């Protein structure tokens, strides 16, 4: 790893990845115009797997971990997210609510690995939960209770995938995601056949236009291969404390992209809810680093000036 400060080229790369991940929610909405959600998710992971699996070495990870991650992220996170985004929640709100994964990850780590929850994490959770409550209370049709439940469950599945991935901290994440897709696509295809049916699958594929297939490829190549490859490259060269906080911008790009390209309204209550959730996320991610930084200031010395 190199210095904590990012060269501008590396910062631009990190912002590019965050922009891709955030505006990806707009791309999902475009793909869902013609494809059933489970089929769309299955195609996403099929093209993330093929042909990359023939060129990217399998990470030194147990098959059971790859299988668990593939099912949790594929069928759990994205399967449920795509279903929710058909008509139950707007792309902007989906990009925000799914960030609940950060708090579900803390809860699962506490329950499964006996990690101790810190006081600041309770504060962060309370702030984020308040934002979700605002969405439930003042929804304008851009989210239904079912949509929120589906996206929150998607966040829980994402958190489960995080816990599985943490068992292999040194694994190449791009290879991890590509090989785990081997266990994402088959169950999604099976669920699509079972719940969406062959007529809907056939109609979706035949009705899909160039924009739809571009959305599928963007999910696979842009969001998965480019995103994870560049993010992993940056994490290999800079401390995680420098790179990870930039992911807080994902819902910012998600809500802005949805407003610009899909015309999603951003009334005051929605911005307030976003502010609460984002503040909770920021406290969860940044507080330990800020506390550690200020702890290094000698007693009686002036604190560093605010930027």
Task: List where the protein language model places each region.
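Hydrophobic/aromatic residues within transmembrane alpha-helices
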Residues: 31, 40, 44, 84, ...
